[in-house]
Amino acid sequence: MPEPLTPATPAELAEAVRSHPRVLAVGARTKPRLSQVPGDVALLSTRALRGIVEYEPEEFTFTALAGTPVREIAQALAEKGQYLPFDPLWLESGATLGGTVCAGTSGPGRFRFGGVRDFILGVRFVDGLGRLLRMGGKVVKNCAGFDLPKFLVGSLGRYGALAEVTFKVFPAPAARLTLKLKASGAEAAARVLTEAAASRWECEALDFLPDGRSVGLRLAGPATALEAVSREILARWPGQVLSPGEAQTIWTELREMRWAHAGGALVKVAITPNVIAALCTAVESLDSTRLHISAGGNVGFVSLSTGIPPAALQERLRGLGLPAVTLCGNAPLWCGARATPAIAGAVKQALDPQGRFPSTED
């Protein structure tokens, strides 16, 4: 496959789209399955399209070019005591802002404050006609094309090429505390997740860990309050408070997907807490398969070893009626049940009437 083109400005990105009959914008390709497209599709790398365009700490918003590594943004925010609460995945691996938006990937922190979709405010993007358009805005209270930026989250770049993105951010918490709670299995873990999610503890992150026998519960806020809440939680379930170093190791491994098999398929599954046990049973029959349940039981990540045929997982997910998308590896892009809403076709026709960007079937 030819090397991707590397436009360095939004105008160059628009020109590159107009110059090719079929295109797809890609970032750092930390989720490589999403950029596996037919050979006639020209890849447009956004790696040269990087930098923070505007950052207003007092307004809690920033605007950055799509190819900007999320790590650079996180560092700039940290200097002002702010952060992106949704725990962007593959942060240390070089994931870009545009790739994070198009993949719709969020980490454990999504549980309390929401995912990528809840923080995006506006975009500049190139549509299928090569027009550089702006939707949304640069302030929180804005209704200019408000829904379209959110619609682009998880779109896999099939509606246009992102050039610039505006996000809102939050003040960083004063302190964090992580508990590792014992769970004898999937059903027990599901009960812990459900009860903790409905509690008054305001958990920042709530995950069934890949070890299959424990729940990671992260709290954020004033240190004295966290200590009191942790005692209450440990009176309800057996477990322990982790040291800061132990906690950082766990959450970093989850965020960077280091728990997953290297080289195997990694599949993101949309779930609800009531199907956790069924999903665990389904994947346990696949040798060496690993599972991580995140966001309080609302998303699952399944990692297959290289020797397991993806069709086996696909069959089980379809049997459970669970939609899934493959992020890494050679499994089908849509690796589960799938129902495409009618609005998706209407938006595709409006933004890309010539089919310049790949269809969602590619």
Positions of the model-derived regions?
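N-terminal glycine-rich flavin-associated loop
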Residues: 1-23, 46-93, 105-138, 173-181
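Glycine-rich beta-strand-to-loop/alpha-helix junction loops that act as flexible
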Residues: 24-31
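Conserved glycine-rich FAD pyrophosphate-binding loop
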Residues: 37-40, 47, 240-362
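Short, conserved charged micro-motifs
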Residues: 71-73, 186-191, 224-231, 275-281, ...
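A conserved active-site cap/scaffold subdomain adjacent to cofactor or substrate pockets
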Residues: 176, 182-183, 191-243
